[in-house]
A protein has these predicted regions:
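Conserved phosphate-binding and hydrolysis motifs of nucleotide-dependent enzymes
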Residues: 19, 62, 66, 92-94, ...
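Conserved catalytic-core motifs of GNAT/GCN5-like acyltransferases
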Residues: 2-3, 116, 129, 134-151
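Acetyl-CoA-dependent GNAT
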Residues: 2, 7-9, 14-87, 98-108, ...
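Acyl-donor (CoA/ACP) binding surface of acyl/acetyltransferases
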Residues: 88-91, 140, 149-151, 155-158
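Conserved acetyl-CoA-binding loop-helix of GNAT-fold acetyltransferases
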Residues: 84, 90-104, 122, 126-130
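Positions that flank functional sites
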Residues: 45, 120, 142-143
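Conserved beta-strand segments that form the floor/walls of ligand-binding pockets within enzyme
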Residues: 57, 78, 83, 92, ...
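Conserved GNAT acetyl-CoA-binding A-motif
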Residues: 105-116, 139
Length: 173
């Protein structure tokens, strides 16, 4: 189990599939994290109508503190969103969330993962680079709130079961 610094030895970080009941908590995170947050309807659509969509919630002590989503198409995963509550940032929780999303994608048979990130979001870019993502170009004027460019990044995923962890190291909750 993961232990979070400053939360004591018994504090466990949990990951689980997002449900419709999570949307109110996700909306709080969404509004804290993004200048152009998705709507409740967008999340509802993703969870009920998009068979390519996979979303997870990260909980600490039973409380949603982050979430991430991706579309899995053929052998590629496209990260749609990843965000952590403002009060929990700076504690490597975004990294843990990204790790879990990458593990899940590999488990589902995905070989590569892609995302777009604001060119001004250097903190996120450093995290993605640390996890093996490389820049593959720009989408000019991608963000409609300020016409900021998006950096396109790609990473190869390790085959499921060979992500650098020992077999049996992941515990079920």
């Amino acid at each position: 189990m993961d232990e979070i610094e400053g939360y004591g030895q018994d504090a466990a970080l949990q990951f689980r599939l997002m449900t419709l009941n999570d949307i109110p908590d996700v909306m709080v995170i969404e509004h804290e994290a993004f200048t152009m947050p998705w709507t409740e309807e967008a999340f509802r659509n993703e969870l009920t109508n998009n068979h390519f969509a996979k979303y997870m919630v990260m909980e600490l002590e039973g409380r949603a503190i982050g979430y991430a989503g991706m579309w899995t198409i053929m052998d590629e995963a496209h990260i749609t969103n990843i965000a952590v509550r403002e009060a929990y940032r700076g504690r490597k929780l975004g990294e843990k969330l990204l790790d879990e999303l990458m593990r899940t994608a590999a488990y589902l048979g995905m070989e590569r993962m892609t995302l777009e990130v604001r060119v001004s979001n250097l903190v996120a870019q450093r995290l993605y680079e640390k996890k093996g993502f490389e820049s593959a170009g720009l989408r000019k004027g991608y963000y409609s709130d300020n016409q900021e460019d998006a950096m396109i990044m790609w990473a190869n995923l390790p085959p499921a079961g060979r992500s650098g962890e020992e077999e049996g190291s992941v515990t079920d909750s």
